[in-house]
Design a protein with these regions (language model features):
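Short histidine-centered loop motifs in beta-beta connectors
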Residues: 45-54, 58
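N-terminal, Lys/Arg-enriched amphipathic/low-complexity engagement segments
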Residues: 1-48
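Gly-rich Lys/Arg/Thr-decorated short loops/hinges at beta-loop-alpha junctions or inter-strand turns
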Residues: 107, 136, 159-175
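Acidic low-complexity segments
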Residues: 87-137, 141-142, 147, 151-153
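Conserved small/polar residues in nucleotide/adenosyl-binding loops
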Residues: 182-183
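Conserved hydrophobic positions within beta-strands
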Residues: 78-80
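Short hydrophobic beta/alpha edge segments that flank linear recognition/processing sites
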Residues: 56-69, 84-87, 94-101
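Small beta-strand-rich domains/subdomains or short beta-sheet motifs embedded
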Residues: 71-73
Length: 183
């Protein structure tokens, strides 16, 4: 079957002015959350919790399955309802961890603690990024620790953050960079 293409793509109106001056707001999830173990590029993470376990916000619930993989961290506290195959976004099946949110948002030990990164080595920062399961927000969910791993690190003078938001209405990256950056 021939794949049809067209020149130029689709360029909807952006409407960024509707949200760019609004305050940043935290929306707390409610009810049941489903964490897919293949939500990032690379090897899926392996569940480290089982049905009935209590989990805390910030706790690792699935460990990275290799270098190009990422930990999955619970965003809520609650009880694991199931560890089972579920349909994923691409229509296939993947292992999922289902957590019933208790609404308390109890943090795991050491989570949410401010950290002065100026006193840390590059390897210590990399370890924190890897443990946290941080991935890119693009479609691939590329593990950030992979991007930050270099053979022989040199002194870093600048950090360039890609805050480009191509979707209509979306301004959260722009606002976060503008209001939360440390210079």
């Amino acid at each position: 079957m021939e794949i049809k293409t067209f020149h130029g793509g689709v360029h909807p109106a952006e409407h960024k002015e509707l949200s760019k001056e609004s305050p940043l707001t935290q929306l707390l999830p409610k009810g049941e959350l489903v964490y897919m173990t293949n939500q990032h590029i690379g090897k899926p993470a392996s569940p480290v919790v089982k049905k009935g376990d209590r989990v805390l916000a910030g706790q690792i619930i699935a460990e990275a399955g290799g270098f190009v993989s990422a930990n999955i961290v619970s965003s809520v506290s609650g009880t694991v309802k199931a560890v089972e195959p579920r349909k994923n976004a691409s229509g296939g099946s993947a292992m999922a961890i289902v957590v019933e949110n208790d609404g308390e948002y109890t943090l795991a030990e050491g989570v949410g603690v401010e950290c002065d990164t100026n006193g840390l080595t590059g390897q210590e920062i990399l370890s924190k990024v890897q443990k946290a399961g941080i991935v890119g927000m693009g479609g691939a969910g590329f593990p950030t620790h992979v991007k930050l791993t270099v053979k022989e690190p040199e002194k870093i003078n600048f950090v360039i953050a890609n805050g480009a938001e191509c979707e209509p209405y979306i301004t959260c990256d722009d606002k976060t960079l503008d209001r939360k950056s440390v210079v």
